[in-house]
């Protein structure tokens, strides 16, 4: 996505830049929908039938699965905004938002120490809240500073086809790497 946004910036075509951003939002929404469908079908099946979870902790494991899926969806939806910041080379914004994210995660860790409720559920919910705050910060910053992020989302079929092909291969490569690194943990469980 950064590649397409950077190329459009270089061309100086504001309308094409807006279409590229809009298309990237649509593509990420489609990916997010696929993730939700996979988690709600295969993820729940795997959790309930294949995972070795102690008695009485299945409820907490379900919370973690749902909150983790929420974090993943929020992160997917942040990608076009992160790409705009990177393409515009506004690294100070990226640094400040990352600093906020790190601080919030530190507060989550400290808050767990004082939490009277189930720490696993609390952790999952607080990490979802952190992801939501970070997502809103990226969106607010981009909408304020970058013209292409304002306005309505429009659908350009040819651009969706072109960008989703590239993004799909990138997503497949990242997914294979994730399965490679995390698959050992699943198999050992």
Annotate the PLM regions.
Residues 41-44, 54-78, 99, 125, ...:
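Alpha-helical transmembrane segments of multi-pass membrane proteins
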Residues 92, 103-136, 140, 144:
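Membrane-interface helix-loop junctions in multi-pass transport and translocation proteins
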């Amino acid at each position: 996505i950064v590649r397409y946004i950077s190329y459009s910036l270089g061309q100086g075509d504001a309308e094409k830049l807006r279409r590229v951003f809009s298309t990237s939002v649509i593509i990420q929404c489609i990916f997010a929908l696929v993730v939700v469908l996979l988690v709600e079908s295969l993820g729940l099946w795997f959790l309930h039938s294949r995972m070795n979870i102690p008695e009485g902790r299945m409820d907490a494991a379900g919370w973690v699965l749902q909150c983790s899926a929420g974090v993943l969806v929020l992160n997917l939806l942040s990608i076009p905004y992160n790409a705009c910041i990177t393409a515009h080379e506004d690294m100070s914004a990226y640094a400040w938002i990352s600093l906020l994210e790190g601080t919030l995660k530190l507060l989550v860790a400290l808050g767990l120490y004082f939490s009277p409720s189930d720490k696993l559920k609390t952790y999952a919910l607080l990490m979802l809240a952190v992801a939501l705050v970070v997502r809103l910060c990226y969106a607010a910053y981009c909408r304020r500073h970058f013209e292409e992020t304002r306005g309505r989302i429009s659908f350009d079929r040819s651009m969706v086809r072109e960008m989703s092909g590239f993004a799909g291969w990138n997503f497949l490569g990242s997914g294979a790497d994730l399965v490679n690194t995390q698959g050992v943990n699943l198999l050992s469980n």
